[in-house]
Amino acid sequence: MNPRQATLALFGVTIIWGWTFIWLKRAMTVADAYGAGVLGATLFVTLRFALGGVLLPLLPGVRDAMRERAVWRDGALLALFMFGGFLFQMVAIAQLSPAVSAFLTSLYVVFTALLLAGWHSHLQSTSLLCGVVLVTFGAGWIQGPPQLHFNWPEWLTVLGALLFAGHIIATDVVTRRVSPIGVTFSSITLAALMGLLLLDLQMLVQPAALGELLREPAFLQPLLLSAFFGTFVALLLVNLCQKLLDPVRAAILYALEPVWATLLAISYGMVTANGWLLLGGGALLLGNLVAELAPRRDST
């Protein structure tokens, strides 16, 4: 696989993540209706990883990779970033407007560039930095100017964005030294175990809500879709393909997710179409085109 093929594969991942945003909103709406927002978020994340990892042992090479200690060590690192980011985002998403959530989550693009600049003691190329600015603006304004209040859901989303940036950088490092398929399985499995531990504590407070959500089709349908497409398919492609791209280039590409999420939200009547979609979406696309001018990473 070459960098261009990897870019196309990860482009497909952004479309999957756009759908995942819709499924997530639906599931959290149901959980909030039962008065179990935090429990619902933990349950969703836990089962999303657990169900998404069930099919991975069927892939060739996974069982052999599972015997390597390094696969589990690196999988634990990815799991911490991944589980924390998704959980913080889900807990906060019900309290935020789509515009604010999209903008604050998109800060992972900036965080990725800043963390790498601090790590390597130099800035990225001019093309990548311009792409970072454009996609951050585009993600924030795709549904109108975000109205920030600096409350706890917003700070929680910012923390989630920081963890997503850590996951992007860690993925670049980890998938170069251990089996990408093996670390996909170990990270998903460990993330599910983290969720299970947290879920056990929350069940002490709301034991009845768990059974109600597990019997609710409106909660289970988006959960199953997210588990297969958002976890099994998307994370497998990320771990196989991202190492062929610069981490900042990958972060810029991932920022296309709000375009698909907004278009889908419009089609389902969740939001209305307006000129901000053209402005924000145009900035996101332009940012990716500018980033393509940056020197490509060697695919070897």
Feature map (PLM): residue ranges:
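Glycine-/small-residue-enriched transmembrane alpha-helix faces in small-molecule transporters
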Residues: M1-L43, F88, P146-V173
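Membrane-interface helix termini and inter-helical loops of multi-pass transporters
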Residues: W23-A36, G140-W152, Q202-A218, P222, ...
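Hydrophobic/aromatic residues within transmembrane alpha-helices
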Residues: A27, F44, A92, S97, ...
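Transmembrane alpha-helices of multi-pass small-molecule transport proteins
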Residues: Y34-G84, F111-L115, L134, L163-A170, ...
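Helix-helix packing/entry segments at the starts of transmembrane helices
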Residues: L47, F83-L87, S101-Y108, A170-L193, ...
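C-terminal transmembrane-helix exit sites in multi-pass transporters
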Residues: L55, G61-D64, Q89, Y108-C130, ...
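Hydrophobic transmembrane alpha-helices of multi-pass small-molecule transport proteins
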Residues: L56, Q124-G144, F164, G275-P295
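Specific transmembrane alpha-helical segments of multi-pass solute transporters/efflux pumps
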Residues: P57-S101, T105, L134, A139-W141, ...
